[in-house]
A protein has these predicted regions:
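Composition- and surface-driven signal marking solvent-exposed, interaction-prone regions
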Residues: 137, 146-151, 180-181
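Catalytic histidine-centered segment of alpha/beta-hydrolase-like enzymes
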Residues: 171-181
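Alpha/beta-hydrolase fold catalytic core
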Residues: 1-143
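A cross-kingdom marker for long, charged
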Residues: 134-137, 165-166, 174-175, 187
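Active-site-adjacent alpha-helix of alpha/beta-hydrolase-fold enzymes
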Residues: 142-162
Length: 189
């Protein structure tokens, strides 16, 4: 409990009460609760004041609030410059879309829902000995944590000798951190 608390910044009491199983949303809410903030899901380096500090969940993803509007604005500007006419406004996220998405190949549960491609990767590797995998992840990403990706690959018949893991000092979108983006480009070229 002491080490867990030390490495995460969470109180020993919270870690103990969580039975050493702290969910990402609980971590986001609890880490800066005393200051009235929650940290971001896509990038936990971002923080945002919560309406109710005592609430169970963060009000929003502070990281998405930090950069979504810039990306949407840039996309609409680019569409205009290249002559693309859109009828609907592009949105960076849409709860209706998530709720109506066809989640084939998903676990049989309500949330979190995700598509797990790793059994297919393992199958493809067994059929093609040249098939290699590159996994890049940001260490501040609480939406798709690095160790989760690694665990999925280990658990689904993937030949780990043909997998390259690359961790970046960034969140989910490593291109938001210039040194990470530069290194990523070098690695994939």
């Amino acid at each position: 409990v002491k080490e867990y608390s030390f490495y995460t910044g969470l109180s020993e009491e919270f870690v103990r009460n969580s039975d050493l199983r702290v969910e990402a949303s609980d971590f986001r809410k609890e880490l800066l609760r005393d200051e009235g903030f929650s940290v971001g899901r896509a990038d936990s380096r971002y923080k945002m004041k919560d309406y109710v500090a005592a609430g169970q969940y963060p009000d929003t993803d502070a990281s998405m609030e930090g950069f979504s509007s810039a990306y949407v604005s840039a996309l609409h500007t680019w569409f205009s410059e290249i002559g693309v006419e859109t009828v609907m406004l592009y949105q960076s996220s849409d709860r209706d879309l998530y709720n109506n998405w066809d989640w084939n190949s998903t676990q049989d549960q309500k949330w979190p829902r995700y598509v797990n491609p790793t059994p297919h990767i393992g199958y493809a590797q067994r059929g093609n000995e040249e098939f290699k995998v590159y996994v890049s992840c940001g260490i501040y990403d609480l939406a798709t944590p690095c160790f989760t990706a690694e665990n999925f690959l280990y658990d689904n018949g993937v030949d780990m000798e043909r997998v390259i893991f690359s961790e970046f000092e960034a969140g989910h979108m490593m291109y938001n951190h210039q040194p990470s983006f530069d290194r990523f480009l070098k690695e994939v070229n």
